[in-house]
From Swiss-Prot:
Source organism: Variovorax paradoxus (strain S110)
Family matches, as SUPFAM superfamilies: S-adenosyl-L-methionine-dependent methyltransferases
Catalytic activity reported: adenosine(1518)/adenosine(1519) in 16S rRNA + 4 S-adenosyl-L-methionine = N(6)-dimethyladenosine(1518)/N(6)-dimethyladenosine(1519) in 16S rRNA + 4 S-adenosyl-L-homocysteine + 4 H(+)
InterPro entries: KsgA/Erm (IPR001737), rRNA_Ade_diMease-like_C (IPR023165), rRNA_Ade_Mease_Trfase_CS (IPR020596), rRNA_Ade_methylase_Trfase_N (IPR020598), rRNA_adenine_dimethylase (IPR011530), SAM-dependent_MTases_sf (IPR029063)
PROSITE patterns: RRNA_A_DIMETH (PS01131), SAM_RNA_A_N6_MT (PS51689)
GO molecular function terms noted in the UniProt entry: 16S rRNA (adenine(1518)-N(6)/adenine(1519)-N(6))-dimethyltransferase activity; RNA binding
Taxonomic placement: Bacteria, Pseudomonadati, Pseudomonadota, Betaproteobacteria, Burkholderiales
Sites where the protein binds S-adenosyl-L-methionine: H12, L14, G39, E60, D81, N103
Name of the molecule in the record: Ribosomal RNA small subunit methyltransferase A
Length: 255
């Protein structure tokens, strides 16, 4: 019996052979890579990957799909919500930096990206299929309409690029949005910063993104003992990533 895509899992299965080949080419898997695939689904991407790798670890939440995948002798199947997976344990077991790939469920793609952010020091690279509008925000530059909290929180830790456009008809069932593939490579020497403090600052800044920050981030900085110079007569989208990082480094630590 054919598997029916489940809306609650945000399932849209890749079915275009040409697109699949293009994605595999961008990933460039090599035998022995410590690769982990999130959401393998019906194995459209899984099969060409494992043919090149020899072995592949996959994370699948859907019980029926996980059962099917276990029939493949070259796959290690982790039946779990990816947000509960300890990627540090996987990296330790592989004794190598992880390569993480996947057609991410669009309904929880941002939480997955933030979950992986905590393991970036253990990851060699990431290749994900996502909504194109999400990738546009991820790679956006300051002073553009797509520049957002997501832009800042990923760009301080990754070098990213949109490598492939994927139209809706490449999926079954077709989503109502355009998709794309993003490459994410963790920076070899990221700035030394408290990620939680940076996240707090960025969240406050973008809480009213169309207004100047005098009454949002400016007020927050005063309340947290910041004694440096910061122009709060700007909108959050006008502030470069490096300046947010510098703020997080300069604000006194919590008592």
């Amino acid at each position: 019996m054919a598997h029916i895509a489940r809306k609650r899992f945000g399932q849209h299965f890749l079915s275009d052979g040409g697109i699949i080949d293009a994605i595999v080419q961008e990933i460039a898997p090599q035998p022995g890579d410590a690769m982990v695939e999130i959401g393998p689904g019906l194995a459209a991407l899984t099969q060409p990957l494992v043919e090149r790798l020899g072995r592949l670890t996959v994370i699948e939440l859907d019980r029926d799909l996980a059962k099917r995948l276990r029939e493949h002798p070259q796959l290690e199947v982790i039946e779990s919500d990816v947000l509960k997976v300890d990627f540090a344990a996987l990296a330790t077991r592989f004794a190598a930096p992880l390569r993480v790939v996947g057609n991410l469920p669009y309904n929880i793609s941002t939480p997955i990206l933030f979950h992986l952010l905590g393991f970036a020091h253990l990851i060699a690279d990431q290749h994900f299929m996502l909504q194109k509008e999400v990738i546009d925000r991820m790679v956006a530059r300051p002073a553009t309409s797509d520049y957002s909290r997501l832009s800042v929180m990923l760009q301080w830790r990754y070098r990213m690029e949109n490598v492939l456009f994927v139209p809706p008809e490449s999926f079954d069932p077709p989503p109502r949005v355009d998709s794309a593939v993003v490459r994410m490579v963790p920076l070899a020497e990221p700035p030394a910063v408290d990620a939680a403090r940076l996240g707090e600052i960025v969240q406050v800044a973008f809480s009213q993104r169309r207004k100047i920050m005098r009454h949002t981030l400016g007020k927050w900085l005063d309340e947290h003992g910041f004694a440096g110079q910061f122009d709060a007569q700007r909108r959050a989208e006008e502030v470069p990533v490096a300046e947010y990082v510098a703020l997080a480094q300069a604000v006194p630590p919590r008592p």
